[in-house]
């Protein structure tokens, strides 16, 4: 749309073409597959033998076929996780698939992945962990040569790459040349968005949402100040900032299971299609993107439960938004840019500059039952709206349906069903003249949220003398550690931050062991409890 010919101007930080394509996709897939799949851990330490990697029935083509059939247009593969084990034939390390039994050392999972993406028309993305716990040069300036070498292999030998995903694990302790890495991506994969934060902030296109639960904030502005990424302020990452200095939308990452890697113990803890629908509304429906992880098993296959869930989720999604109930409605605007086509006919709603409280009224041809409204700004002109109220006339009375502090590329709000013949959108706050280019009303079947099923904590415990180490099978929120164990002694509880243990609680217990942490943990994969006396081998610790 050429908004300039209607006298409309852009405001503030603006999206680039890559970000607009990212918005259009809406939802993407993550495949966590690697050494951790075979060690039953979430984070490896780099000491694992390559011989442990041996999928017995690997079919990467079927992974991509499944997610293509479920409507996903982009998938990211963990080419290398923190343990440093590489899923391609890299020349920079022996800690790779070339020294595994898989296809007698001739296999290349990255090749199989990118070939399948080309076959099904799915865009390929790469996760190359900045942190490498196996590589001896990690933490030194020399590691940058090593990393750029591997990055170059991935970006030149496997076709076009559309997303490069960098997380911050281990990044505060290393000397990374983020600019050099980013310039490598820009040169070799010019259409790829870069996901990242910390030192990579000047070059990133997409930001972390501040949690690994797949939930964006309310509001969730695509604009944000750079400092929020540099220091990973999770509250700001989740909500963004109206009028922020950078345009960096939020990607909400979440796993279909409690863990990011496959654990057989979690086969019955797969998120339901209903829960995936809720997460879609809490990410894409709040102006962000959805990044859903599906971990292949030790066989090298996606499990049936996982595939069934995403296929049903896609069916629900397509059905929910198949019919815009505003079709055939009449539109009245308080004011409208001269010559602008109607928003219900492929146009937009842009009030005149002097209209400080613009209102859009939609008169339905008949009384219609609705429970969902979708709005969207012409985001290429900037994210402007900071306050909107949507009402409907129900039985002749004006009834508020919802209010919101941001709209962005897409806002989807559900509410209790009403039967209305008129819908009113009132924009009461905007940084500049607002422009809406999307509006829809829908009746979505009730969604029974079964997320509680997925919140159960799976963990394995190793007890050595007076120390209990608990390895979590994913990221969980918990604030209480307990055990059906009567004891009288002192204790210290530590949470693993990725590189070392942090002391979070100490004290004495007399009676059954039950300790409440001062602050909930929602990002640790591992914890350790040190006691004054030895711990019985059969003690079962419970996190809640």
Model region roles, listed by residue range:
Residues 1-385, 392, 402-405, 409-414, ...:
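Mature catalytic domains of secreted/periplasmic carbohydrate-active enzymes
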Residues 305-312, 320-323, 347-402, 406-456, ...:
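Aromatic, loop-rich ligand-recognition surfaces of beta-strand-rich domains
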């Amino acid at each position: 749309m050429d908004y300039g010919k209607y006298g409309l101007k852009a405001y503030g930080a603006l999206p680039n073409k890559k970000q607009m394509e990212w918005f259009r996709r809406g939802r993407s897939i993550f495949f966590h597959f690697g050494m951790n799949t075979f060690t039953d851990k979430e984070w490896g330490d780099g000491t694992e033998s390559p011989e442990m990697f041996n999928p017995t029935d690997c079919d990467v083509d079927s992974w991509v076929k499944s997610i293509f059939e479920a409507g996903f247009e982009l998938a990211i593969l963990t080419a290398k996780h923190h343990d440093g084990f590489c899923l391609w034939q890299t020349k920079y390390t022996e800690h790779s698939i070339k020294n595994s039994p898989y296809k007698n050392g001739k296999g290349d999972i990255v090749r199989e992945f990118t070939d399948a993406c080309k076959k099904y028309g799915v865009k390929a993305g790469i996760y190359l962990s900045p942190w490498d716990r196996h590589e001896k040069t990690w933490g030194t300036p020399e590691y940058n040569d090593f990393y750029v070498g591997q990055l170059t292999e991935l970006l030149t030998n496997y076709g076009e790459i559309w997303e490069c995903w960098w997380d911050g694990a281990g990044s505060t302790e290393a000397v990374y040349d983020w600019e050099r890495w980013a310039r490598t991506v820009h040169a070799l994969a010019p259409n790829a968005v870069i996901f990242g934060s910390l030192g990579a902030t000047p070059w990133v296109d997409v930001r972390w949402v501040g949690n690994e639960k797949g939930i964006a904030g309310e509001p969730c502005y695509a604009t944000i100040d750079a400092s929020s990424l540099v220091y990973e302020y999770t509250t700001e990452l989740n909500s963004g900032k109206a009028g922020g200095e950078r345009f960096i939308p939020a990607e909400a990452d979440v796993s279909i299971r409690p863990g990011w890697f496959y654990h057989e113990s979690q086969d019955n803890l797969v998120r339901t299609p209903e829960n995936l629908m809720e997460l879609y509304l809490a990410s894409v429906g709040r102006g962000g993107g959805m990044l859903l992880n599906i971990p292949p098993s030790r066989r090298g296959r996606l499990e049936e439960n996982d595939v069934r869930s995403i296929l049903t989720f896609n069916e629900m999604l397509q059905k929910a938004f198949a019919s815009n109930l505003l079709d055939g409605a009449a539109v009245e605007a308080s004011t409208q840019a001269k010559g602008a086509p109607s928003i219900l006919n492929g146009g937009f709603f842009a009030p005149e500059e002097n209209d400080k409280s613009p209102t859009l009224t939609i008169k339905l041809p008949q009384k219609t039952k609705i429970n969902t409204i979708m709005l969207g700004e012409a985001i290429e002109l900037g994210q402007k709206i900071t306050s909107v109220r949507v009402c409907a006339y129900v039985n002749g009375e004006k009834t508020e349906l919802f209010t919101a502090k941001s709209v962005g590329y897409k806002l989807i709000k559900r509410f209790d069903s009403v039967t209305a013949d008129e819908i009113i959108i009132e924009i009461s706050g905007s940084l500049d003249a607002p422009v809406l280019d999307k509006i829809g009303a829908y009746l979505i079947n009730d969604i029974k949220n079964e997320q509680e099923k997925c919140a159960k904590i799976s963990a394995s415990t190793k007890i050595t003398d007076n120390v209990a180490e608990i390895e979590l099978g994913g990221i969980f929120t918990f604030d209480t550690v307990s055990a059906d164990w009567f004891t009288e002694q002192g204790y210290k509880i530590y949470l693993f931050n990725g590189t070392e243990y942090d002391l979070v609680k100490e004290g004495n217990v007399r009676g059954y062991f039950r300790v409440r942490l001062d602050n909930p943990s929602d990002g640790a994969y591992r914890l350790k409890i040190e006691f004054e006396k030895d711990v019985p081998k059969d003690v079962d610790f419970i996190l809640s």
